[in-house]
A protein has these predicted regions:
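Hinge/lid segment of periplasmic solute-binding proteins
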Residues: 1-23, 39, 161-170, 238, ...
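Extracytoplasmic/periplasmic solute-binding protein
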Residues: 2-24, 48-92, 107
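Extracytoplasmic/periplasmic substrate-recognition and gating elements
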Residues: 12, 35-36, 112-115, 155-226, ...
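C-terminal capping/gating helix-and-loop segments adjacent to ligand/active sites or protein-protein/ligand interfaces
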Residues: 16-18, 180, 245-305
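Short glycine- and hydrophobic/aromatic-rich loop-to-beta-strand nucleating segment
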Residues: 24-28, 77, 186-188
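Short helices/loops that flank or line small-molecule/ion binding pockets
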Residues: 32-33, 52-56, 123-140, 282, ...
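Glycine-centered hinge/linker elements that transmit conformational signals in sensory
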Residues: 51, 90-120, 169
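Beta->alpha turn/N-cap motifs
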Residues: 69, 141-150, 184
Length: 313
């Protein structure tokens, strides 16, 4: 998936090389789950059941926080094999019945108090997840590179208030898992000075093919290495072996990311693809929270998103 991302432009040529990547993972309060006999959800159906169970135990809670509405929408289209965008015209394909149905389902979850998002909460939902007072959540879906932000602050006794667990995000079909691949890729531009091009290539080559660099960068940044060989690097192997939901939560996140490497997907890039992402993010936030008839609210949100995509591009 990392390699193919650089060849997605229709002519079979390689334009970018992967540097480091992240994805989304499900952070959960393992202590709470274990104490209450709750199973980590692997599907969205199970997620609904878990949210209901958590709400029954802690009525003041918001069981699930999801940081990126855009990622959520796009990932659902990928899991459902439903159209989102195309590199060829027509570009904007996301206004369809399948997508409207999953948005309607999540709207009902929001109305039941099961979830919030970064836009609706007004900040990263990790703030709810690590909260010790007031409203809190017990699950948070966010970037794998931000694992340390999903860890509560140590108490005066040197212990964490709860242990964090990390898992693959829920799926529509666990036999065909799909999780988003994000993070920087690099490309080299042609320049009039060939020495600049050579220097660029040597720099890119080092960043993308050196196992030592990839291992060190991953451990420092929280991003996942793009070379399979890094998994056998002695320093990186030792790092991952320490994985836990406390001091080594970044290692735990990395181990989950490595275990799901066959599930990664990317969306086609074209002039206007970033607009589509912004608009489906707005669409989902509006559809969850707007007052009114469900179908009318959702219909309006989809139509406005398509109109804005076409207007801007």
């Amino acid at each position: 998936g990392y390699w193919n991302e650089g060849k997605q432009f229709g002519d079979g040529l390689m334009y970018t090389l992967p540097w480091s990547k992240s994805t989304e993972v499900l952070y959960y309060n393992k202590t709470f789950f274990d104490n209450n006999g709750i199973k980590v959800p692997t599907t969205w159906d199970e997620m609904e059941e878990v949210c209901a169970a958590i709400k029954a135990i802690d009525p003041a809670s918001i069981p699930l926080g999801y940081d990126s509405e855009g990622n959520w929408f796009i990932t659902m289209t990928e899991q459902l094999e439903s159209p989102y965008t195309s590199a060829l015209e027509p570009h904007y394909l996301f206004d369809n019945e399948t997508n409207r149905e999953f948005v309607k389902r999540f709207r009902s979850w929001y109305q039941k108090g099961y979830l919030t998002t970064q836009t609706l909460y007004g900040a990263y939902t990790s703030g709810l997840f690590v909260a010790e007072n007031g409203t809190r959540s017990y699950m948070s879906i966010g970037s794998s590179a931000g694992a340390t932000h999903q860890r509560p602050t140590k108490g005066a006794d040197g212990n964490y208030p709860f242990e964090v667990g990390i898992a693959t995000i829920p799926q529509v079909n666990p036999d065909r898992p799909k999780v988003i691949s994000q993070g920087p890729s690099v490309c080299i531009f042609n320049k009039s000075n060939p020495q600049e091009v050579i220097a660029s290539w040597l720099f890119v080559k080092y960043m993308t093919t050196s196992t030592d660099f990839q291992a060190e960068f991953s451990m420092t940044s929280g991003y996942v290495p793009v070379l399979k060989s890094v998994a056998d690097h002695p320093v990186y192997k030792e790092f991952v072996s320490k994985a836990n939901g406390g001091d080594y939560i970044s290692a735990l996140s990395a181990s989950v990311c490595l275990s799901q490497q066959e599930a990664y997907y990317t969306s086609p890039a074209f002039n206007g693809s970033s607009t589509a992402r912004s608009q489906v993010q707005n669409l989902l936030a509006k559809s969850l929270s707007a007052q009114g008839n469900d179908d009318e609210v959702i219909d309006k949100a989809f139509k406005e998103a398509i109109t804005e995509c076409e207007y801007q591009n």
